[in-house]
From Swiss-Prot:
It holds the Pfam family YcgL. This is YcgL domain-containing protein AHA_2135. PANTHER family: PROTEIN YCGL. InterPro entries: YcgL-like_sf, YcgL_dom. Residues 1-85 form the YcgL domain. Gene3D superfamilies: YcgL domain.
Amino acid sequence: MLCAVYKSRKKAETYLFVERREDFSRVPEVLMSAFGRPELVLMTKLDPAKPLGIASTSRVMEALQSQGFYLQVPPPPENLLEQHKAQLKAERE
């Protein structure tokens, strides 16, 4: 399965996968508005045996077939303060 991958100019590390290049017809307007003007990053052939990074290839393929797009957002930032507090608490016990 071929797909086009676009990055957002508004949201860092946010990518939109669509079935065909320049075809955003199945992407909701509100999402396109929040995403901003898409910038093509690459055209790729999805292969379940090859990892994509954050998202699983099979999940991306399933979303493309069912809804016509897949939105990849960055993982939430680490809360270093909470980690530090938990470590201090564990050391005291």
